[in-house]
C-alpha cells in the first residue's frame, strides 16, 4: 500500500501589448493518490487506486497605473494606423495598440478575470491474470468531475479612429456582465457548479504466441455523462423555435453510448534475422470527451450582455450600473447574444489510429526504423452561426439598410432583433493524417550517441478539433472548410549528438594518469541539436461588412448609402451570405497569375496584390490555410563538465547556447491569420489589394517565434551548475 500527495503553486505575468496591459496567471494544482496492491494468487494481482486531482487556477487582466484613469475591465479599441514617419528599418505605418483591462476568457467572451476551482475523483481497479503465454488485464474506472467556474466581464469601447476617441465618440460599446451576478433570466446568482462522470472499462491480453511473435489485443469502453449545472442555473437557446428557456433541465447534447474501442498490435521478429529485424503493425479506435469549455455554454449564457451601436448609451465613459439598470429582457430589440448548440450535437469525438513499421539493427549499435502512421478523425467539433442575415430593408429617406435575420421581426422598414448573431456548436467534423517516419539512432556506446528523425506528413480536414476549431467561413456549409489543418507540417527533421571525451576513470585514455590531469581533462561532454521544419499553414482572412451599398447608376460598391439632392442613389445588399461579422472569419478571392509571396529578402512576406474583395453575395474562393509561413531551423550547442567529489557525488557545470548561428527565426505573419483591412469604397470587388489598402503591416514578418530561452529565439547563452548525489 502506498500514498502520495503533491501540491504546486505558481504565478505568471505576461505583457499583453505595448500599452503596459498585462495578464496575471495563478495556479495551485494538487493531486493525491492512495493505492492498494494485492497478490490474490501467484498468477492473480489486483490494484485498487483512489485519486484526487484539483487544479485551482486564476487569471486576471492587469492595467497600467495611470493617475486619474481606471481601465479595470475596460478595453479601448482603436481602428486605423499610425505613420512611423520614416523610422529606419520599419514599415510605413503600424496598427494602434489598444489599452485593455480585459483578457480573452473564452473563444467568444472577453472579461477581466476567470476563477476556476475544479476537482475530479478517480476510483480505479486493475486486475492482472497471468495464464500460460497470456498476460490478461481487466480494469474499470469511475471518475466524477466537478467544475466551479465564473467569468467576470467588462466593457469594450470601439472607436473608428483617434479623432473619434479624442471626441469621446465611440462607434460601438459592448458590455459583458458577470456570470455570478443576479440573472434577470433565471433569477439566480453565484458560481456555476457543473458536474459529469466518466465511466471506463477495458480488457486487454498480451499473448506471446511464439518467442518471436507477440499479439496484443483488447477492448475499451468509455462513457461520459453530459454536463449538468447543479442548481439548473442555465439559460438555453432553442434554435428551432428561436426562444430562450431559463432553468433548463434537459441534457444539453447527446452523449453516445456505443463507445467501444477495439485495439490490437502485432510484433514479429523473423528467426533468420537473429532478433535484428522487427515488424510491427497496430491500430485502434479511441474516444474523447472534447474540450470542456465548449460544453459549458448554457451555463455561461446566464448573464447580461449587450452591444450598443446607437442611442443614449453609446457614450464614453460609462459604468456597468448604467447597462444593468437599463436592461429589459422583454425588450423586442434587446439583441441578446447567447451561444447555442445545433440539434443533433453529439459527443464523443472519435479517432481511428493505425501504424506499421520495420526496425533493423545495423552495425555500430545503430538502429534504423521506417514507419507509417495514420489516423482518421470523426464526429469532430464544428462551429458556425445562427440567426443569419436573410435580407435587407432600406429606409427610403436615409437609404440606410437594416439587416433582416432569421429571428427578426419586420414592420415596414423597421426591423427589431431580440437576438444578435449567435455562435453555434455542433459535431460531425472530420480529418485525416498520414505520415512517413524514418529514424536512425545509435545507442550510447564508446562515448557517443546519435539520433536522427525525419517525418513527411499531411493533415487535412474541415475541423482542427475542439481546442482549435474555428467558425466556418461559409455560413451554410462546413464542407468548404476542408483543407490543411493548422498542425500540418509537411517535413521536419531533428538531429542530435552527444560525445563524451574518452579521458579519465573508466575511459579509454587517462585512467591511470595523475589526479590533476584527470580532473581537468575528464568528465567533458559535448552535445549538439539541429532541428528544422517547413512552415505552418496561414489562413488569409479579410474584413468585410455584412451589408454594402451598390450605386444604382455606376454599380460601384460603397460602405454607406449615397444620397444626392434628397435622392437615394444606392441600394443596400447583403455582402456576405448569412452575415458572420461577430465571428469575423471571411476569406478573400485569389487573383490568378499573381504570386502570393513576395520574392525578396525583406520582411514583407505575403503579397496583398494576390487577393481581391469577393463580389457582394459571394464567399471568397481562397481555401482554408491555403498559404504557408516561412520554415524554421535552429542549431544548438551544449558543453558540460563533471567534477567528481566522491564515488557517488559530483558537481556538473553546463553551458548551453541556443541558435548558435543567430538565424532570424520569424513567426508566422499575423499570428497565422493575416487579415486584410476592410477596403469597401477604397477598392472595388475583384480589384487586387494594394499594400496601403491591405494595411501597412499585412503579411509582414514582424516578430520571432519566441523571445524566451529555447526554440525560436535569437542567440542566447545559459549557464547552469548542478550538484548530483
Give the role of each language-model region.
Residues 17-22, 31, 35, 109-113, ...:
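Extracellular loop and loop/strand-boundary signature of outer-membrane beta-barrel proteins
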Residues 67-75, 79-103, 229-425, 554, ...:
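Solvent-exposed loop/turn elements at secondary-structure boundaries
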Residues 2-52, 56, 229-260, 389, ...:
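Extended hydrophobic/aromatic segments used for targeting, binding, or gating
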Residues 1-45, 49-50, 120-122, 196-224, ...:
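Surface-exposed extracellular loop regions of Gram-negative outer-membrane beta-barrel proteins
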Residues 8-17, 26-28, 97-108, 177-185, ...:
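Flexible, solvent-exposed coil segments and beta strand-coil junctions
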Residues 8, 16-24, 63-82, 118, ...:
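Flexible, surface-exposed loop regions and adjacent strand-edge segments
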Residues 128, 195, 212, 224-226, ...:
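Short, solvent-exposed micro-motifs at the edges of structured domains
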Amino acid at each position: 500500500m502506498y500514498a502520495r500527495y503533491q501540491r504546486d503553486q505558481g504565478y505568471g505575468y505576461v505583457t499583453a501589448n505595448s500599452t503596459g496591459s498585462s495578464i496575471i496567471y495563478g495556479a495551485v494544482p494538487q493531486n493525491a493518490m492512495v493505492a492498494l496492491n494485492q497478490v490474490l494468487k501467484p498468477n492473480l494481482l489486483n490494484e485498487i487506486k483512489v485519486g484526487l486531482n484539483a487544479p485551482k487556477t486564476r487569471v486576471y487582466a492587469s492595467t497600467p497605473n495611470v493617475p486619474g484613469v481606471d481601465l479595470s475591465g475596460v478595453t479601448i479599441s482603436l481602428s486605423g494606423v499610425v505613420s512611423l514617419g520614416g523610422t529606419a528599418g520599419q514599415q510605413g505605418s503600424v496598427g494602434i495598440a489598444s489599452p485593455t483591462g480585459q483578457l480573452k476568457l473564452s473563444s467568444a467572451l472577453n472579461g477581466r478575470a476567470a476563477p476556476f476551482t475544479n476537482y475530479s475523483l478517480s476510483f480505479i481497479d486493475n486486475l492482472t491474470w497471468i495464464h500460460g503465454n497470456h498476460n490478461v488485464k481487466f480494469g474499470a474506472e469511475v471518475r466524477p468531475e466537478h467544475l466551479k467556474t465564473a467569468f467576470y466581464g467588462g466593457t469594450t469601447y470601439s472607436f473608428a479612429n483617434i479623432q473619434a476617441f479624442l471626441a469621446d465618440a465611440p462607434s460601438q460599446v459592448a458590455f459583458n456582465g458577470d456570470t455570478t451576478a443576479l440573472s434577470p433570466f433565471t433569477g439566480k446568482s453565484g458560481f456555476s457548479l457543473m458536474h459529469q462522470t466518466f465511466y471506463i472499462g477495458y480488457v486487454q491480453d498480451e499473448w506471446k504466441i511464439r518467442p518471436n511473435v507477440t499479439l496484443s489485443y483488447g477492448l475499451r469502453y468509455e462513457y461520459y455523462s453530459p454536463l449538468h449545472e447543479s442548481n439548473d442555473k442555465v439559460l438555453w437557446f432553442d434554435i428551432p423555435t428561436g426562444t430562450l428557456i431559463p432553468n433548463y433541465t434537459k441534457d444539453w447534447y447527446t452523449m453516445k453510448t456505443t463507445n467501444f474501442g477495439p485495439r490490437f498490435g502485432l510484433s514479429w521478429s523473423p528467426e533468420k534475422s537473429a532478433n535484428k529485424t522487427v515488424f510491427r503493425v497496430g491500430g485502434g479506435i479511441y474516444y474523447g470527451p472534447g474540450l470542456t469549455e465548449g460544453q459549458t455554454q448554457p451555463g455561461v449564457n446566464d448573464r447580461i450582455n449587450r452591444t450598443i451601436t446607437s442611442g443614449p448609451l453609446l457614450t464614453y465613459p460609462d459604468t456597468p450600473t448604467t447597462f444593468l439598470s437599463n436592461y429589459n429582457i422583454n425588450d423586442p430589440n434587446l439583441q441578446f447574444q447567447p451561444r447555442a448548440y445545433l440539434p443533433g450535437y453529439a459527443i464523443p469525438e472519435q479517432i481511428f489510429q493505425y501504424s506499421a513499421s520495420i526496425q533493423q539493427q545495423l552495425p555500430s549499435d545503430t538502429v534504423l526504423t521506417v514507419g507509417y502512421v495514420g489516423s482518421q478523425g470523426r464526429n469532430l467539433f464544428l462551429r458556425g452561426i445562427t440567426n443569419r442575415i436573410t435580407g435587407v430593408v432600406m429606409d427610403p429617406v436615409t437609404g440606410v439598410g437594416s439587416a433582416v435575420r432569421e429571428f427578426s421581426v419586420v414592420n415596414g422598414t423597421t426591423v427589431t432583433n431580440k437576438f444578435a448573431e449567435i455562435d453555434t456548436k455542433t459535431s460531425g467534423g472530420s480529418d485525416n493524417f498520414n505520415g512517413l517516419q524514418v529514424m536512425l539512432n545509435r545507442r550510447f556506446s564508446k562515448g557517443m550517441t546519435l539520433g536522427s528523425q525525419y517525418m513527411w506528413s499531411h493533415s487535412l480536414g474541415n475541423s482542427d478539433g475542439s481546442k482549435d476549431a474555428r467558425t466556418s467561413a461559409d455560413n451554410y456549409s462546413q464542407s468548404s472548410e476542408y483543407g490543411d489543418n493548422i498542425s500540418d507540417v509537411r517535413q521536419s527533421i531533428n538531429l542530435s549528438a552527444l560525445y563524451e571525451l574518452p579521458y579519465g576513470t573508466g575511459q579509454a585514455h587517462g585512467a591511470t594518469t595523475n589526479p590533476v590531469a584527470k580532473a581537468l581533462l575528464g568528465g567533458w561532454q559535448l552535445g549538439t541539436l539541429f532541428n528544422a521544419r517547413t512552415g505552418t499553414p496561414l489562413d488569409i482572412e479579410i474584413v468585410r461588412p455584412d451589408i454594402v451599398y451598390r450605386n444604382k447608376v455606376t454599380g460601384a460598391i460603397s460602405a454607406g448609402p449615397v444620397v444626392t439632392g434628397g435622392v437615394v442613389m444606392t441600394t443596400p445588399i447583403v455582402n456576405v451570405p448569412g452575415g458572420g461579422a461577430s465571428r469575423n472569419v471571411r476569406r478573400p478571392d485569389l487573383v490568378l497569375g499573381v504570386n502570393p509571396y513576395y520574392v525578396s529578402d525583406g520582411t514583407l512576406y505575403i503579397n496583398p496584390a494576390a487577393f481581391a474583395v469577393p463580389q457582394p453575395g459571394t464567399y471568397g474562393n481562397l481555401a482554408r490555410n491555403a498559404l504557408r509561413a516561412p520554415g524554421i531551423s535552429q542549431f544548438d550547442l551544449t558543453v558540460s563538465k563533471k567534477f567528481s567529489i566522491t564515488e557517488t557525488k559530483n558537481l556538473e557545470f553546463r553551458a548551453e547556447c541556443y541558435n548558435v548561428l543567430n538565424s532570424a527565426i520569424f513567426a508566422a505573419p499575423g499570428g497565422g491569420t493575416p487579415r486584410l483591412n476592410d477596403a469597401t469604397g477604397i477598392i472595388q470587388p475583384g480589384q487586387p489589394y494594394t499594400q496601403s489598402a491591405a494595411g501597412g503591416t499585412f503579411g509582414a514578418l514582424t516578430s520571432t517565434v519566441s523571445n524566451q530561452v529555447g526554440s525560436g529565439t535569437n542567440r542566447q547563452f545559459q549557464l547552469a551548475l548542478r550538484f548530483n548525489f
